């Protein structure tokens, strides 16, 4: 599966490591470069600095081919907006939002 995760805090980083470890293609988006330190050295996915509702960034990471999208930042509004964009604009089949 190709999975995009928005938010690299405790939840996002653990989810990214788990999915990457199981062989899934994972992209993690976070607003700070510092957050990616949580992923450790074994994470083999892609990391991008930005926000989860930036249309250009989402296109850049290949949201059109994403099988799943997980918005798990610490901000409910960010998660809901990002999830809406993924579902309504890009028709990602499986969309999850942490609220």
Label each PLM-derived region with a short phrase.
Residues 1-99:
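Cytosolic regulatory regions of ion transport systems
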């Amino acid at each position: 599966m190709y999975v995009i995760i928005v938010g690299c805090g405790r939840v996002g980083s653990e989810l990214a490591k788990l999915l990457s470890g199981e062989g899934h293609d994972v992209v993690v988006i976070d607003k700070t470069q510092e957050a990616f330190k949580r992923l450790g050295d074994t994470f083999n996915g892609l990391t991008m600095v930005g926000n989860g509702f930036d249309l250009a960034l989402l296109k850049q990471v290949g949201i059109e081919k994403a099988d799943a999208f997980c918005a798990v930042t610490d901000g409910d509004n960010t998660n809901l907006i990002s999830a809406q964009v993924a579902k309504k604009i890009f028709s990602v089949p499986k969309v999850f939002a942490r609220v």
